[in-house]
Amino acid sequence: MRVELIVNGEMRTVEVEPRMSLLDCLRERLLLTGAHAGCEHGVCGACTVLIDGAPARSCLMFAVQADGYAITTIEGVTPGPGELSPIQDAFCETHGMQCGYCTPAMILTAHALLADNPDPTRADIVDAISANICRCTGYAQIVEAIALAAERMRGLNRPARKP
C-alpha cells in the first residue's frame, strides 16, 4: 500500500504493509531513527512525534492512518545542519538528558507546548511532559530546560556568547 506523508516538511511516498505502525515506517522505511520503540503499547512516550503539530504516539498509529498528514520528527526540529533548536540547546545546557532515550520525545512535546503556550507555568510544563517517561533525570532538569527555552524563545535570558 502506498502512503504519502509530509515528513519534516518534505513529501515522502512510502510503500507499507497495511498494519505497519507509523513508528516502524519512520524507522525502517524512511531511516529516521529519532523516535524510539519503548513499550510499543503507547505508555512510555518514547515514540512521540508531532502530527500536524500535536504530540502523538507513533507506535499506536498505522502508517496508512498518517497518509497526508504533516509529521515532525526530532530530525526535523533543527534550524539547519549542525545547529540546535532553542529547546535542544536548553536541554544541553541544563543537563536535561542522561541516557537520551526519552529526549527526542521530550523535545518534540516541548515544541508543541511552546507553540501553543510561549509562556508556560511550571505546572503547564509538568502536565505537557507527563505522558513521557524518563527513568534517569527525575524530570527536574527537563522542566528547567523547557522553562529556559521558553524564556529564550521570548527574547529573555540570552545564552552567553560562545568564543
Annotate each PLM feature.
Residues 1-163:
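Signature of N-terminal electron-transfer/Fe-S-associated modules in redox systems
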